[in-house]
Amino acid sequence: RDRLSVTRLNDGRLKIKFTDQLLDEVIAESLRHISRKHDAYKIQVECEELILAHMDVRLIIQVLVNLIDNAIKYTPQGSTICIRGLRTDGRAQISVEDNGPGIADEMKSHIFEMFYTGKTTIADSHRSLGLGLALCHSIIEAHEGELTLKDNYPHGCIFVFTLPLSEVTLNE
């Protein structure tokens, strides 16, 4: 299913339905989709209020669920996973931070490629990301945003993506 989605996104056949959404509500909805999985983790959400972003909410929830699922999959139970939402440089910025083993430097340039799993042997504990990150990358690009990976020192990953802010302003 992911491969079909990536193909349809990349060749323009997947119709994107843009609406203006409050970022904190989209993050909360994403967490409802993974609620059964994250009981053994502390999920911390830090989101500035009233960030209205222009997005296809269904696709952005898919991106968030994928990034949070990866963080859960590769982080020891009992760990904290932090999701942040903020305004920066005229964009909405969302990050998912974990303190798992991280991703080796030599793999970082490949993680958004389709079918790249980051495994060299079956015994490796490296992340097996397959289509998920390629799909996330395509979705964010279709939103004229950017998906990047940073190191979370001393270990772990921070996946950061940006979305356009809504042109509508909310009266606070």
Task: List the predicted regions and their residue ranges.
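Short conserved segment of the HATPase_c
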Residues: I103-F115
